[in-house]
């Protein structure tokens, strides 16, 4: 059987690459527990932040272990790193009191108050025994009391977590404050001094340690899971990845007002709800809601960004539906009339999986507005919406987090076989489960590395982020081009940003540019060894003064990362590493905190306006790369118009409020639609079209699929030869994205995958296959569903197409 020989080849590759020892039920059980732990820790921290929005202090405190503590650096002492002046509170009861007191009237409960708490960009480190963990996060709070007072606080968490019984708890929440201020004046460095590097709990090498296969480790205490339970739980993780990607992709389409792509993501009766007003089901209802944001496409001066933060996902036990919950902050503006808005929304979206194709779609986008404010007036006085006299009711929290003290089982006991790609002979099940688990851990390892990079670049630690790259990995230096290898990346960075950046323990810095790498869409290869990442770069910063010059960094810039990551074997170690790092920036920026992204006029009521600030990276650069040419220049003619308008690219340059093109590494995840206007740049790394030997596929890695494999199927009744009589001719056409090759066999079955096999056919070069079925094989007078299955290959996803036939 050709079909299974394809699968076997893949399985062997995985076994060789990722496991020294054979995959067993025990090793899978242990690895699964590790990955589920990493996810639960993220869910704990993200839900903690979600609870703050609604002043649920008791529940927030219930996430702490009984002897867990909170240390909240006050930043008034000699040194932010010095614990001695940090508030130190132990135990859930005292922590609840502290949280409540700290929020005061800015608790999200008082009429007009706002308590937005963001925790993002996690680097999670699980201990070897799987019982404790550390996590670094960005933390940012936008708060207001509705009566004119506001607070902004930003900094870094270096937290610790412990497995207590069945659940992960916070054992230490350690906050290092870096900047603070108010809506009126913006923010600046706490203490008005230079800021140290907050110690990292990881090294570049450690940041890439795979989650799985941590041998030797403690012997498993519990019993091993059954194969069925493993299938169930691993499938749920795989599906969770798809859901998260879909929600985050939707956000990017909304930002660019790509309404056709947004609508493609919905079921035929999909809806959008805002504050419980729900659109009529279907495309026209969706279109009318989307049109309220404006017509399709962005024109000069329009900002429609909706960054998505701290998404948590809960799968239904049957794996056919899911809820995604999180925070979306609309940053809306029209530069032409100098108007802008903040829109703080909780979302709680419902998604469903099409059981036929296994493709996830949106059933309902559901937004509950926390607060909407004009940029000029801000959120301190309650904004313009919603007018609310009583405290808001939070949309339900996920994953049993509303009662975190109770010992809820971490996963349902029941199971159902949810293998996306059909059934395999038992002997192939365990290696295939290992591959599926690796695909999900690739998601978290990619986020880990992405976040680790984000923190290092904030602190401009050249050698540290150089070392996050693979030996043959490459990184773009904005406006210049790509440098390949950790040492060349490090040298380029130091040449550009100056010698202080090479020191592991640099002097305090007057200003820090923050790179929030959030809203990740991670496309994982079939074997789980490589991934393609799209991420938002929401750049902000802090400085000594909030209101002047470069140090007046309390504004925002927007960019997009297009990266790839690989599992590299080097000097006997296996590590997840950055293969390719590319940033397209800046799509927009705030001239200052005062004026925001739409040049809002706040001069009458606020502090003096700040001088217009050009690209932050450029300003910060103190050196020059003239004597250190890149391996690939963004001026390379082979890029064509790819970098036209971007800093360093071919003229004319395009800067906000003009609109730069936005590029895509994937097709629409539901419809397979290819982004128009030459903005599709996939598959493969951005500089790969200039350097084909940089393609993953030329380096022993698989290129992740860029979207669904679509199968359209036709059936016609034709005259067979005399002996057979009439036949049903079934024709299938398979398609994926440009430059994605479909090859292999397709099967025709009557009904589902375990039902009758009616034929197996090799695809032709155009992706067509045709089957001839004797009419007598189908029940006369009855509709038969004929299904064409494709197992996928190392470049494209599996697919399924069906046709109903009445003979
Ligand atoms: C907290 O309690 C756990 C279990 O009782 C114990 O293992 C741990 O050492 C304690 N932590 C601290 C900081 O006391
Ligand atoms: C949408 O349509 C599907 C299929 O017809 C149906 O099962 C489902 O109940 C509908 N959902 C809503 C919210 O109308
Ligand atoms: C500015 O233009 C937008 C449309 O882009 C409109 O919605 C908004 O009301 C206008 N604001 C002002 C203050 O005129
Ligand atoms: C949207 O969310 C609100 C608030 O949680 C809820 O009351 C409403 O039922 C949801 N709407 C849909 C269509 O799910
Ligand atoms: C939480 O769970 C515990 C233990 O199951 C139970 O005693 C308690 O009443 C629950 N609390 C809430 C608010 O549901
Ligand atoms: C993240 O990096 C740490 C080292 O800092 C490593 O131990 C851990 O396994 C990685 N976690 C994930 C989720 O990749
Ligand atoms: C910060 O502001 C003070 C006045 O408030 C000014 O003297 C100082 O030069 C400013 N520093 C910077 C770095 O702009
Ligand atoms: C199905 O039939 C229609 C009409 O004859 C034709 O346009 C289309 O190309 C066919 N599709 C396939 C997959 O054969
Ligand atoms: C597959 O089809 C067979 C035969 O029609 C049926 O008995 C079986 O329940 C189906 N299985 C699933 C998972 O739908």
Feature-to-residue mapping (PLM):
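Solvent-exposed beta-strand/loop surfaces, strongest in extracytoplasmic domains of secreted
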Residues: 704-807
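Short, cysteine-centered beta-strand-loop-beta hairpins and adjacent loop/turn segments enriched
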Residues: 141-151, 180, 330-341, 372, ...
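Short, low-complexity N-terminal intrinsically disordered segments enriched in polar/charged residues
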Residues: 20-50, 54, 58, 62-66, ...
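Short beta-strand edge/turn micro-motifs at domain boundaries
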Residues: 132-134, 154-203, 207, 321-323, ...
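Fungal secretory targeting signals
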Residues: 1-20
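A hydrophobic membrane-anchoring alpha-helix module
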Residues: 177-180, 185-225, 370-372, 377-427, ...
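A solvent-exposed, acidic/Ser-Thr-rich amphipathic alpha-helical stretch
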Residues: 57-139, 259-330, 462-543
């Amino acid at each position: 059987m050709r079909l299974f020989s394809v699968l076997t080849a893949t399985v062997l590759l995985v076994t060789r690459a990722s496991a020294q020892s054979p995959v067993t039920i025990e090793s899978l059980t242990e690895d699964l527990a590790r990955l589920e732990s990493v996810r639960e820790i993220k869910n704990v921290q993200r839900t903690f932040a979600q609870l703050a929005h609604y002043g649920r202090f008791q529940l927030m405190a219930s996430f702490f272990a009984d002897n867990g503590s909170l240390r909240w650096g006050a930043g008034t002492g000699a040194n932010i790193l010095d614990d001695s002046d940090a508030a130190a509170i132990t135990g859930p009861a005292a922590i609840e009191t502290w949280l409540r007191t700290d929020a005061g009237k800015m608790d999200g409960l008082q009429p007009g108050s706002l308590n937005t708490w963001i925790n993002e960009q996690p680097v999670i480190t699980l201990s070897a025994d799987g019982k404790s963990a550390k996590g670094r996060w960005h933390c940012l709070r936008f708060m207001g009391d509705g009566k004119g007072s506001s607070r902004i606080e930003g900094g870094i968490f270096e937290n610790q977590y412990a497995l207590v019984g069945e659940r992960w708890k916070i054992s230490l929440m350690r906050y290092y404050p870096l900047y603070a201020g108010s809506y009126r004046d913006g923010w600046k460095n706490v203490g008005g001094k230079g800021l140290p590097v907050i110690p990292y709990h990881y090294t570049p090498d450690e940041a890439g340690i795979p989650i799985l296969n941590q041998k030797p480790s403690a012997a498993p205490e519990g019993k091993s899971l059954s194969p069925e339970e493993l299938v169930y739980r691993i499938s749920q993780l795989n599906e969770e990845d798809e859901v998260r990607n879909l929600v985050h992709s939707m956000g990017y389409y909304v930002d660019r007002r790509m309404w056709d792509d947004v609508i493609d993501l919905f079921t035929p009766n999909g809806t959008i709800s805002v504050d419980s007003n729900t659109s009529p089901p279907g495309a026209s209802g969706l279109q009318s809601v989307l049109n309220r944001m404006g017509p399709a496409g962005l024109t000069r001066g329009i900002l429609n960004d909706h960054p998505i933060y701290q998404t948590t996902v809960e799968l239904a036990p049957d794996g056919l539906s899911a809820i995604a919950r999180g925070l979306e902050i609309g940053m809306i503006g029209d530069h032409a009339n100098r108007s802008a808005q903040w829109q703080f929304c909780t979302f709680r979206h419902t998604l469903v999986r099409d059981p036929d194709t296994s493709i996830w779609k949106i059933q309902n986008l559901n937004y509950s507005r926390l607060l909407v404010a004009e940029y000029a007036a801000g959120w301190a006085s309650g904004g313009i919406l919603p007018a609310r006299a009583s405290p808001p009711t939070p949309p339900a929290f996920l994953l049993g987090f509303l009662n975190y003290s109770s010992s809820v089982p971490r996963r349902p006991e029941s199971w159902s076989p949810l293998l996306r790609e059909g059934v395999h002979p038992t002997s192939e099940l365990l290696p295939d489960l290992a591959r599926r688990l690796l695909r999900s851990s690739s998601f978290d390892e990619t986020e880990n590395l992405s976040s680790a990079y984000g923190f290092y670049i904030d602190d401009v630690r050249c050698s540290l982020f150089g070392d996050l790259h693979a030996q043959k990995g490459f990184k773009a230096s904005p406006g210049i081009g790509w440098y390949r290898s950790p040492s060349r990346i490090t040298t380029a960075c130091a040449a550009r940003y100056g010698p202080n950046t090479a020191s592991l323990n640099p002097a305090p810095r007057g200003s820090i540019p923050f790179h929030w790498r959030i809203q990740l869409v991670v496309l994982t290869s079939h074997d789980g060894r490589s991934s393609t990442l799209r991420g938002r770069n929401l750049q902000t910063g802090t400085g000594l003064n909030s209101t002047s010059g470069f140090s007046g960094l309390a504004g925002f810039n927007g960019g997009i990362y297009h990266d790839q990551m690989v599992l590299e074997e080097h000097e006997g170690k296996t590590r997840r590493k950055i293969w390719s790092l590319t940033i397209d920036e800046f799509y927009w920026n705030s001239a200052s905190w005062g004026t925001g992204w739409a040049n809002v006029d706040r001069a009458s009521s606020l502090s003096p306006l700040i001088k217009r600030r050009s690209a932050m990276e450029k300003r910060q650069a103190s050196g020059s790369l003239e004597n250190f040419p890149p391996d690939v220049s963004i001026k390379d003619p082979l890029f064509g118009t790819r970098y036209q308008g971007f800093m360093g690219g071919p003229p004319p340059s395009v800067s906000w409020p003009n609109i730069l093109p936005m590029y895509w590494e994937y097709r629409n995840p539901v419809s397979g639609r290819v982004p128009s206007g030459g903005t599709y740049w996939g598959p493969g790394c951005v500089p790969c079209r200039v350097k084909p030997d940089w393609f993953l596929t030329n380096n022993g890695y698989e290129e992740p699929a860029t979207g669904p494999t679509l199968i359209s199927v036709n059936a016609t009744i034709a005259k067979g030869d005399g002996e057979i009589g009439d036949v049903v001719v079934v024709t299938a056409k398979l398609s994926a994205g440009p430059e994605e090759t479909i090859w292999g066999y397709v099967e025709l079955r009557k009904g589902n995958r375990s039902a009758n096999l009616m034929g197996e056919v090799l695809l032709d070069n155009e992706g067509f296959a045709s089957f001839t079925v004797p009419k007598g094989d189908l029940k006369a007078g009855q509709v038969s569903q004929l299904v064409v299955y494709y197992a996928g290959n190392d470049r494209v996803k599996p697919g399924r197409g069906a046709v109903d036939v009445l003979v």
